[in-house]
C-alpha cells in the first residue's frame, strides 16, 4: 500500500506541465554535455599566427557556443516530446506505442517546420520512426 507521500508524488508527476518542464531541463543538461564533448572533439581551423592562448580562447568560445546551441535544441526537443506524449496519453487514456509515434511526429514536425512543409513532413516521419524504434528497444510499454 503506497504512503500518502508516494501518492502525492505520483499525482505531481502525472501533471503534463511538470513532466514537460522536467524533460526540458534534463534535455538541456544532456545537450550541454554533448555540446561540450563534441565541441572538444571538433578540430577548428586556427591561424598559424595565433598564440596558444588565443587558440585556447577561440576553442573555448566555439565549445561554449556549440554547447549552448545543443542545450537549447535538446531542451525544446525534450519539452515538446514529453508534453505531446503526456497530452496524447491523457486524451486516449492509453499507455502504448501509438502515443510515442504521435509525440515523435509532433516533435519532429515542429523542430523542422522552419524548412517548410516538406521538411516538416520528413521530420515528423523520421522522428516518429526513431521514437518508436527507441521505445521498442527499451520496451517501456508492455
Curated annotation (Swiss-Prot):
Source organism of this protein record: Arabidopsis thaliana
Keywords tagged on the record: Membrane, Mitochondrion, Mitochondrion inner membrane, Transmembrane, Transmembrane helix
Cited function: Essential core component of the TIM22 complex, a complex that mediates the import and insertion of multi-pass transmembrane proteins into the mitochondrial inner membrane.
GO CC terms, sorted: TIM22 mitochondrial import inner membrane insertion complex
Membrane topology: Multi-pass membrane protein
PANTHER family per UniProt: MITOCHONDRIAL IMPORT INNER MEMBRANE TRANSLOCASE SUBUNIT TIM22
Transmembrane segments: 21-41, 70-88, 97-113, 120-137
Protein name (Swiss-Prot/TrEMBL): Mitochondrial import inner membrane translocase subunit TIM22-4
InterPro entries: TIM22 (IPR039175)
Signal peptide annotation: none
GO biological process terms, semicolon-separated: protein insertion into mitochondrial inner membrane
Family: Belongs to the Tim17/Tim22/Tim23 family.
Subcellular location: Mitochondrion inner membrane
Amino acid at each position: 500500500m503506497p504512503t500518502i507521500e508516494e501518492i502525492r508524488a505520483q499525482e505531481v508527476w502525472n501533471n503534463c506541465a511538470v513532466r514537460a518542464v522536467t524533460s526540458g531541463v534534463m534535455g538541456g543538461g544532456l545537450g550541454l554535455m554533448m555540446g561540450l564533448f563534441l565541441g572538444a572533439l571538433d578540430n577548428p581551423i586556427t591561424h598559424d599566427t595565433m598564440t596558444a592562448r588565443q587558440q585556447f580562447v577561440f576553442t573555448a568560445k566555439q565549445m561554449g557556443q556549440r554547447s549552448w546551441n545543443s542545450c537549447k535544441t535538446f531542451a525544446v526537443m525534450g519539452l515538446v516530446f514529453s508534453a505531446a506524449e503526456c497530452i496524447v496519453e491523457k486524451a486516449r487514456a492509453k499507455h502504448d506505442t501509438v502515443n510515442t509515434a504521435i509525440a515523435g511526429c509532433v516533435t519532429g514536425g515542429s523542430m523542422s517546420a522552419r524548412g517548410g512543409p516538406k521538411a516538416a513532413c520528413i521530420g515528423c516521419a523520421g522522428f516518429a520512426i526513431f521514437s518508436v524504434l527507441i521505445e521498442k528497444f527499451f520496451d517501456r510499454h508492455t
